[in-house]
């Protein structure tokens, strides 16, 4: 089930926000409500090469993503940007669910980015085509991975305030480098496939035991 919204002139999703909140309020205390709201903010921020190339330091990082000149943005500024945007968009809906539900509420951390540029350019989603991915190219993979890590940090801060548990990507789906393994790529620039989804369902099943 997904929130109904318009995209590229078509309605996607099948349930209104009000209907989803009612369904959440009807759950029993022994149920489990799992949110996969949003998730692509890190891709919107970092996938398409920005006209002004930028980078930032993670706290445990001693080098930039590459050696070319880049506009350096303070980590705290990047983190605040993610927290502010998530809080006012995706996490606003998540908070509504938390307030409506009597049961435990969890939120799925989105899968990490794909490292393979060739795969990404085969079938990028309309958002990225409209933002010029075919003309401007793709950002450095390490920058994209760092943007995902910042989104995770932002979600950790927000969900802790809400009392929502975060569910990490299944361990077997992630490379040692931190990127999504290629066998779990969906046929687009950003999403994971059904095999990945099955492993997530296994995680949720284990939580209910």
Question: Where does each model-flagged region fall?
Answer:
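Acidic carboxylate-rich catalytic motifs and surrounding loops in phosphoryl-/glycosyl-chemistry enzymes
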Residues: 109-111, 161-182
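A short beta-strand-loop structural module common to alpha/beta enzyme folds
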Residues: 1-15
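A basic- and aromatic-enriched beta-loop-alpha substructure that forms the phosphate/nucleotide-
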Residues: 13-86
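Short amphipathic alpha-helices and their capping/turn segments at secondary-structure boundaries
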Residues: 16-33, 89-105, 156-157
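Substrate-gating cap/lid alpha-helix
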Residues: 117-168
